[in-house]
Amino acid sequence: RKQYLTMRLFFYLLSPFGLRLGYVFCDLITLVALALNTEIVKISKININIAYSSKNKEYRESLLKRSIKQSIRSYYETLFCLSRSQKILNKSIFKVENRFLYSQTNRDFGLILLSAHNRSVDLLLNQLTTQEDVTAIFKPIKIKALNEYVRKNRQKSGSSVFETNFTGVKELFSALKRGEAVAMAADQVPAKNMGVYENFFGRKVYTTNLIPSLHSKTKAPIVSLAIHSDSLTK
């Protein structure tokens, strides 16, 4: 209990502001990161140049700035999510577009919830689990105390979380067969020998084929989910 409270305080100190003011803080960090040409900037620039090679330099530079801004906001959202009460987190979601998931409470089939991972997966998962229990898999964090804290937070609403391995995949199939919902991020890196190499923008990339496999074997519908904050109030 003491360790849990210590970890929660640690994450709170790293995200002392509400999301609205926190985004302003994140945007200032973005300017610093761009000015210093940090590692995240270098990697994002390489990826954008590959994916948008046909676009002009001005377009790619603009996209780079927006990408870094979204990434840093995502980090802050995760820290915020890991240190706030459920009441505060519920107030952070201002609007839900297309309430399909909310209308599927009485069903006899499973659902595959697929996140584009454009923002914080933890904040999105937290919102989902206020509606129903969700089974999800995640790559374990190397620091044991941090890993246990994050796992407990993701399970606090009654949802099940398993590591990205054969056991975790088996649990996803079982949950779908029971008519429950499972959640995954589109860019989730599979464990060794559990993924495939596919061509992305002319390059071989190690990625997951679990999502189409889950769908083909269970016929569970795939629901795409994402978080957006087009302004400081969202």
Predicted ranges, named:
Residues R1-S115, N147-K152, K156-G158:
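Membrane-anchoring hydrophobic helices of lipid-metabolizing enzymes
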Residues L82-K234:
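Soluble catalytic domains of membrane acyltransferases
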